[in-house]
Amino acid sequence: GMSTEDFAEYRTEIGKEPFEYEGHTITGFAEDAFRYFRTLGDKQFIVDSMTAKPGPAWNDFVEAINNGSIFSIITARGHNPETIKDAIYNLIISDHMGINKDLLIKNLRKFRDLSNMEDKSDMELIKDYMDMNKYYPVSFGTDAGAANPEELKVQAMKEFISYVKGQAKEMGKKLYVKDDVNNNFVPSIGFSDDDLKNVEVMKKSFKDEPVLKTYSTAGGTKTRY
């Protein structure tokens, strides 16, 4: 098989002309090439999420969770969105590699207090938080996104930006009612991808959207793009 990082480099060449890859001649996609990136691989994905080596943007993901910030998973994979949610829930509950569920719960309670919302149990707070986040496996239910996911990722990002702006507006209204002077929420969103084509298309599509910052994690290093 070909690693996801190598696939990002070669995907525009596959099926056009034969080329050599690690001693093999690649002429096109294998039959059902993305089977483990779709629902067939859901169970394995949950296992892999607990054992995989963290990527260059992992610390940003940990920071978002620990702060109780809304996040989105936009991926070329086609797993069921609930599978991705379950995998992240497991990471939180197990305090995986820097994730701190107690700090998350503390910050979630802080937000609820600011919004004059009633308190809930720790597990209910985490469940509600997981439901607030967005999960976009753009190949879910279709084969269209696995090989060329960039435009589908753009559509997902448009939806997520709109959602986050709406959440920020609602939070601002609640703080205004509470007479809190710090009621002007301006969301900031970071998007990272190890496929430069995805980063290029995302940056171009949102060049006039100041809330979005794009980063490349190609080659195992996170850089502003």
Question: Which residues are covered by each model-predicted region?
Answer:
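Short, basic/hydrophobic alpha-helical segments
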Residues: 54-66, 150-185
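Conserved beta-strand termini and adjacent loop/short-helix elements that scaffold enzyme active sites
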Residues: 74, 160, 215-217
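Extracellular C-type lectin-like domains
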Residues: 145, 149, 187-188
